């Protein structure tokens, strides 16, 4: 009797595990680099942990975060476009922000994301309407790519390979994060935050991620060279934008707009060192990540950054 009950319990647990082990399905070829399924792709679907809960707003946001198959030619955006997108979200009363820390973190996510879609949301100087889901691109300087925290979108995974890679993107190279114990740490952090508050955040996701998109690989790119970031336009409502030159207490990492390129599907590096010499339309100035010549690889000591605090 005891053996039968034990076998029955094991059977139920196996069935429960199978039912909650989602698979991430990719129905397109989004990357210009070779890629293949990774371990997380067999155990965490597009909805993340929220796929099996009652938080519909969280599930919807997770699904957008994981949407690799944005369509159409990439529309070129500027930092000014990203700030205008943030202002437009405020005008429309789109909810965003969060309070507290896990496990008592409360997020104010939009229940209806259709208001964020391109139609009548924001028109670029070139006359293109863009919004959440649009395929876009921007040129800027990467600042210290690093793993994010454990997130609901990645089913709470804690391994670095299973986390998003967060990249601050700015129009001119921002100061590095000063090491702990630096006598001028407070001043240097303020200067760095002021620079980041004029930029945005862009992210690679772990699903089917090409090796050159890993944090360590991206940190090997010399920060002297601008990069071209291509991917989906996404409104990350889980945070707050900066308040002037200072990050909002709940806005880590610092950014001037909650609009991101997320997920990133292409990263290329410019052979020149100024934004004016790195037009996205000039294909002769761009190099794929895995084809970088030696002089475009960082030789300076790049300080390591820890993963960000867990969000969910």
Q: Where do the model's predicted regions map?
A:
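N-terminal secretory signal peptides that target proteins for export/translocation
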Residues: 1-2
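Bacterial N-terminal signal peptides
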Residues: 5-15
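Sec/Tat signal peptide C-region and signal peptidase I cleavage site
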Residues: 16-21
